[in-house]
Design a protein with these regions (language model features):
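Extreme N-terminal signal-anchor transmembrane helix of membrane signaling/transducer proteins, especially
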Residues: 14-42, 202-218
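Helix-loop segments that flank and shape redox-cofactor active sites
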Residues: 51, 78-86, 109-116
Length: 234
C-alpha cells in the first residue's frame, strides 16, 4: 500500500486523475464480466431444463399414457361383439399409433441434439424395438378378434407379446429415471449459480466501492497534503 501511495504521489494531478479513472473502469469491467459469465451459466442451465429435460420427460410420460391406452383399446376390441364399437376401437388404435409416432419423433430429435441425452440411447432404442414388436402383433390380435377368436387373441396378448410390452415399459421407466436425475441436477445447478452470482456481484460491488474510495482518498491526500504543508509553512 505504501508503494502505491508513493507511486501516486509522484504523479502529476492529471496522472492521478487518470489512475483513478482507470481503476474505476477496470473494476466496473470486472463486475460486468462477472455478470455476463453468470448470465451465460444460468441461461445454459435454463435451456437444458426448458428445451431438453422437461420436454423429454413430458414426451416419455405421454408415451407411457398413450401406449397404455393402446393396450386398453385392444382389450376392449376383444370383449366387444358390436361391429360399430370394434370399428371405433380400431380407429382409436390407429389414431394412437400416429400420436405415438409423432411423440417419439420429437423425443428422438431432442436426444439426437443433446450429448447428455444420448446417454439414454441404449434404453431408448431397446424400448423402441420392444414397442415395434408389440405393435407388429397388433394387426394379428385385431384380426383374430374380428374372426371371433378372442381366446387366441387374448392368449397372444398375454403371452410373448405382453413380454414385449413389459420390456418396453421397463426401458421407458429407466429412461424417465435417468432424465429426471438430469432435470434435478440442472435445477440444482441453476439455483446454486443464482446464489453464487448474487454473492459474487455483491462482493464485487463492495470491493469496487472500497478500492475506488481508498485510491480516491490516496489521490486526494497526495494532492492536498503538499498544499497543506505550504499553507502551514506560510
Amino acid at each position: 500500500m505504501e508503494k502505491i501511495k508513493k507511486c501516486i504521489a509522484n504523479l502529476k494531478v492529471e496522472g492521478k486523475l487518470k489512475v483513478y479513472q482507470m481503476t474505476v473502469l477496470v473494476m466496473t469491467l470486472f463486475l460486468v464480466l462477472v455478470a455476463l459469465i453468470s448470465t451465460v451459466v444460468i441461461r445454459s442451465n435454463i435451456e437444458k431444463i426448458t428445451k431438453v429435460w422437461s420436454p423429454s420427460l413430458e414426451y416419455l410420460q405421454d408415451l407411457e399414457t398413450m401406449t397404455a391406452k393402446y393396450r386398453i383399446k385392444q382389450y376392449q376390441h376383444l370383449v366387444e361383439s358390436d361391429a360399430a364399437v370394434m370399428n371405433s376401437c380400431e380407429e382409436e388404435i390407429t389414431k394412437l399409433e400416429s400420436q405415438i409416432q409423432d411423440t417419439d419423433a420429437k423425443l428422438e430429435a431432442i436426444m439426437s441434439a443433446n450429448s447428455k441425452a444420448q446417454k439414454g440411447r441404449d434404453d431408448y432404442d431397446a424400448a423402441n424395438a420392444a414397442w415395434e414388436k408389440y405393435r407388429g402383433a397388433s394387426d394379428e390380435i385385431l384380426q383374430l378378434s374380428r374372426e371371433g377368436k378372442q381366446q387366441e387373441a387374448s392368449k397372444l396378448m398375454t403371452g410373448e407379446v405382453y413380454e414385449d410390452y413389459k420390456s418396453f415399459s421397463k426401458k421407458l421407466t429407466i429412461l424417465c429415471g435417468k432424465f429426471q436425475v438430469e432435470l434435478d441436477q440442472a435445477k440444482t445447478m441453476a439455483n446454486v449459480c443464482t446464489v453464487i452470482i448474487f454473492i459474487v456481484i455483491v462482493a464485487a460491488g463492495l470491493a469496487i466501492a472500497v478500492v475506488t474510495t481508498l485510491i480516491g482518498k490516496i489521490i486526494t491526500n497526495s494532492i492536498t497534503e503538499p498544499v497543506e504543508q505550504i499553507d502551514a509553512a506560510v
